[in-house]
Amino acid sequence: MNEFPKFKQADYPKLYLEQTDKDLVKILDPNFRYAYFKTIAKGGKSLIRSCKDLHLGRVVCYKSLLPEFADDPIEQKRLLREARVSAMLQHPNTMPTYELGRDRQGHCYFTMKLVHGYTFREIINYRERYDVTQLLDILIQVAYALEYAHTHGVVHRDIKPENILIGPFGEVLLLDW
């Protein structure tokens, strides 16, 4: 049976005291908070990128609408709803939202925890055989997230393997609320 690839040490940079003891600038300009963008994934209407949060010194996941949808008020509302629902669902199997804002062009975005993981689809496509216990564990964790969401009146309308992320520590995260 094939082993799933391990994560690289480079994905987790070391911390140094001089990075944590920097003074905070007098005026925090949200338009200059994020830099070093790198595309991770492209969805039907949105773009997912990693970038550096210059205020907190960490790499985050930055989600925004594709240019052709960025000015559409209906799509903006959907993106805002997704960000707020994700932020309100405080559960180990949901992705935490860090910030919601607008860029220099006035387009909506939100940032989330960046997890160096694989989607359930990637795992299914990679392996020839599966450990049923591991698959059940993934599905149970998804069920926990759904149960939590349902008790808060939230229904996930797009459950599919591409929206389930497995992190390097075995954590299972349900995405795209």
How does the language model describe each region?
Residues 37-43, 48:
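Protein kinase glycine-rich loop
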Residues 105-119:
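Conserved short submotifs of the Hanks-type protein kinase catalytic core
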Residues 138-139:
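Activation segment signature within eukaryotic-like protein kinase domains
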Residues 99-101:
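A short, aromatic-enriched beta-strand patch in the conserved N-lobe beta-sheet
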Residues 66-88:
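AlphaC helix of the eukaryotic protein kinase fold
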Residues 144-154:
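Protein kinase catalytic-loop region centered on the HRD/HxD motif
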Residues 52-59:
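Conserved N-lobe loop of protein kinases adjacent to the ATP-binding glycine-rich P-loop
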Residues 120-130:
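AlphaC helix of the protein kinase catalytic domain
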